[in-house]
Amino acid sequence: MSERKVLNKYYPPDFDPSKIPKLKLPKDRQYVVRLMAPFNMRCKTCGEYIYKGKKFNARKETVQNELYLGLPIFRFYIKCTRCLAEITFKTDPENTDYAMEHGATRNFQAEKLIEEEEKKIQQEREDEELNNPMKVLENRTRDSKLEMEVLENLQELKELNQRQAQVDFEGMLGQYKELEQRQKQREQEEDEQETKEMLERALVKRLRDSDSEEEAENAKERSKKHIADKPTDILTTDTSTSSQGLSSAVAKKQSWDRSVGGLSVKGALGSLVVRKKPADSASKPSHAAPPPAAAAAGTQTGAVKPESSITSSSASSNIQPVSCQNGSSLGLLGAYSDSDDSSSD
């Protein structure tokens, strides 16, 4: 194993290195390398932004016939991440930077150009002052004038700041706040006025609707009162339906008096009951004088008959639709029993 780990090699006495064949490779050979974008750039084809530090698999080659102080310059080929367009840039050893060559534009290039222009102007001035002492004096006078102008401008700015310092900013803010509060209060009052008007309109409409409903109900009640009922409707009329038509306490009292008073006095049904005439008095004429008891009874009945006829006529004249409708069942029963008693007598 130690023989395979030798540190020196054996060269025979007739060794000639020029006779060893060498591998001939092309000078513009390309290598695939992994690198990061050296600056921010934007693709000219699709407008995609490629930021500094993004990694690419680039192809590297040596630029032919271009050297800087004997240092070779390398070119790199990358592809856009969006449209796969080819972008090339190369090294710039003079400025220790990279220079964009094709396929994209470098961002923040304007700032770099301005800096380069300033450096160029400064270099030209130094070259002029190096060989011309009068140029040095002219540049000094120009610089002094520029400095005086700058000081004057600075003094004007200070005076302007002092003038503005005298302004009462707190008072201005207070006035602005007061104006805002007044405007808000005015808007609130207008809103309240509008809501009040809307509520008044709705209230008037509701009052009109209620008035129309009351008028309709009154008309219905009047129509119910003016309906002419038949005398026989009192037998089929229900007390619950008849009591709904009452509108005053006086009418209720009168109806109650009529219904209850029918127990002792012949009621409203007296006009509806047909009285039977005595068959003996109608068929047989009385030839003989009646006995004293019969005469007395006859005088009593004769005295009662006109009274009953008067009461029946007055009851029939006093019968109204309201009384017919307001008769209670107890009053009807009493009146009917009175009529039966009178007929049986």
From Swiss-Prot:
Biased composition (Basic and acidic residues): 217-232
Predominant subcellular localization, coarse grouping: nucleus
Disruption phenotype: Morpholino knockdown of the protein causes small head and a curled tail by day 2. Knockdown causes increased sensitivity to IR-induced apoptosis. In double morpholino knockdown of TP53 and YJU2, TP53 deficiency rescues animals from developmental neurodegeneration observed on YJU2 mutants and radiosensitivity.
Keyword tags: Metal-binding, mRNA processing, mRNA splicing, Nucleus, Spliceosome, Zinc
Domain of life (superkingdom): Eukaryota
Localization annotation: Nucleus
Bias (Low complexity): 308-317, 327-337
Protein name per UniProt: Splicing factor YJU2
Originating species: Danio rerio (Zebrafish)
